[in-house]
C-alpha cells in the first residue's frame, strides 16, 4: 500500500484537465473488444483524466458502447496513431491487439517513437507475442518500457531471447526470478512477471516482489487491468522521480500489483467463483477511497502528535 500512497497525486483546485494523466491504449480487434476496455477502465477508475483507445475499426463501435468516458479512434496504422500519441503521458499496447501481421510495422514505428520521447510504455498481451516473434528486431534502448508477461507469454520470451525450452514447467519462484533477471538483462528492459508472486525485475538486477493476497479466480482480463493501471502509475512515478526509470518501474510495478491483487481479493470475497474482471474493476474506486481516507487519518494523527 505504501507504494500506492506515494504515487497517488493530490487533488487540488489548481489542477487542470489532463494533469492526472492522458493515456493511450493500443488494442482491440474483431475478436477481442473487452481487453482494451479493461485496461482503459482501470486507469480511469484509478484517476486518469483522459483515456484514448486506438483499435481496429471492427472493434470501435463495440468499445464505444462500453463507456462514454473513453475516446475511441478506429484505425491500426502508424499514420493514424503515431501523430496522436504526442499528447499521451503513457502508452499501453497489447490488450486485445490480435495477431494480424500488419500490426508489426506499427509496433516498429511505435518503438522508435517511444525511444525518442522517453514516454512510459507498457507491452502486454499480443504485443508480447509480436516481440517474441521478432525478438532480434526489438530495440535495446527502451529504458521507459515494461513488459508484463504471464507465465505463457514469459515462456515464449525466454525461448526466443534465451533459448530456454521448458519454462512452463518451472514452478520454483527462485528459478523464475533468475530467468526473469536473465531476460531483463538480455533485452535491457524491465520485466513484470505476473504469477503467484508478482516480480518486477530491472536490467540492473534489482527485484521487487508483491505477494499480497489475491483472488483465487484466474478469469481473463486481470492482466489487462494490470497493464492499464501500470501505465498510469508509471506516469505518476515519472512525475515524482524524473528520469530515474529503475526506481519508477519498481514503485509503479508494486503499486499496480497491490491494486489489482487487493481489488481481486475483495471481489472474490463477495462473489466467489462467479467473480469476473468487471466485478474487480468495480472494487477499484472504493479501494482508492479507502487508501485516501487512511492516508488522511495517518496525516492528522502525525500532525497532532507534533503538538
Curated annotation (Swiss-Prot):
Entry's Gene Ontology BP terms: metabolite repair; nicotinamide nucleotide metabolic process
Domain YjeF C-terminal: 1-291
Record bears the keyword Nucleotide-binding: yes
Protein name (database record): ATP-dependent (S)-NAD(P)H-hydrate dehydratase
Domain of life from the UniProt record: Eukaryota
Cleavable signal peptide: none
Enzyme class: lyase
NCBIfam families listed in its UniProt record: yjeF_cterm (TIGR00196)
Source lineage: Eukaryota, Metazoa, Ecdysozoa, Nematoda, Chromadorea
UniProt keyword Phosphoprotein, yes or no: yes
Role played: Catalyzes the dehydration of the S-form of NAD(P)HX at the expense of ATP, which is converted to ADP. Together with NAD(P)HX epimerase, which catalyzes the epimerization of the S- and R-forms, the enzyme allows the repair of both epimers of NAD(P)HX, a damaged form of NAD(P)H that is a result of enzymatic or heat-dependent hydration.
PROSITE patterns: YJEF_C_1, YJEF_C_2, YJEF_C_3
